[in-house]
């Protein structure tokens, strides 16, 4: 009962279900393996996780977002995210040599699962990147360096820029830099691109990670009907 009360108190503090389940697992391990006390999963159940569909912007909303970004560096970064489906951290760690103009591809090296991959470089994105490159001193190492330190930008910096652009463009407040990756995948799904190809472009090891975009795509089609 004390553990149940503790977890309920943490829930009232605003902790998410995933965090509460981590608390639950740690306490359960301590009870079973250290104190050798039976654990009652009925009295202290695990929290049910909410599986919310990701926020997806329409093509016109993407245009409004990019138009709302004044700094060409951040406009280029957001364009890369939508054009390629790259994760925020992957775009931050891009280097000049990762951009292949001849093949219209981007070499993604610093990945979440440590597996290199190639993804799409659209003509529109290349045009924005080219404008950025000439206007910002033609960087040859880190493609999007911090202008003060020359090092990598932080995720929080991009999130701040995104929040301002979202407000200026009057887009859904739930839109984050990562939703550009969601939008990329969903739009490909709606265009009929095979799921395996989308999985490869996104760098998903598990096909189930890609299936969420099928659900979002179906939801969009229902809205059209």
Predicted regions and their residues:
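Conserved catalytic core of the tyrosine transesterase superfamily
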Residues: 1-225
């Amino acid at each position: 009962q004390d553990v149940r009360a503790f977890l309920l108190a943490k829930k009232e503090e605003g902790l998410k279900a995933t965090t509460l389940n981590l608390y639950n697992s740690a306490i359960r391990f301590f009870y079973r393996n250290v104190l050798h006390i039976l654990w009652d999963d009925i009295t202290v159940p695990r929290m049910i996780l909410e599986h919310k569909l990701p926020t997806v912007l329409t093509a016109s909303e993407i245009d409004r977002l990019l138009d709302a970004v004044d700094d060409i560096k951040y406009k280029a970064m957001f364009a890369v995210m939508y054009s390629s489906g790259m994760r925020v951290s992957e775009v931050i760690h891009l280097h000049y040599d990762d951009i292949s103009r001849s093949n219209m591809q981007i070499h993604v090296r610093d990945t979440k699962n440590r597996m290199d991959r190639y993804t799409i470089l659209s003509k529109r994105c290349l045009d924005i990147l080219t404008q950025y490159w000439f206007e910002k001193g033609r960087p040859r190492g880190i493609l999007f360096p911090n202008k003060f330190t020359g090092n990598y930008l932080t995720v929080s910096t991009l999130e701040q820029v995104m929040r301002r652009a979202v407000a200026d463009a009057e887009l859904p407040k739930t839109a984050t830099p990562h939703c550009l990756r969601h939008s990329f995948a969903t739009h490909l799904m709606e265009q009929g691109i095979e799921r395996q190809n989308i999985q490869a472009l996104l760098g998903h090891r598990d096909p189930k990670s890609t299936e969420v975009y099928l659900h979002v795509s179906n939801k969009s089609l229902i809205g059209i009907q």
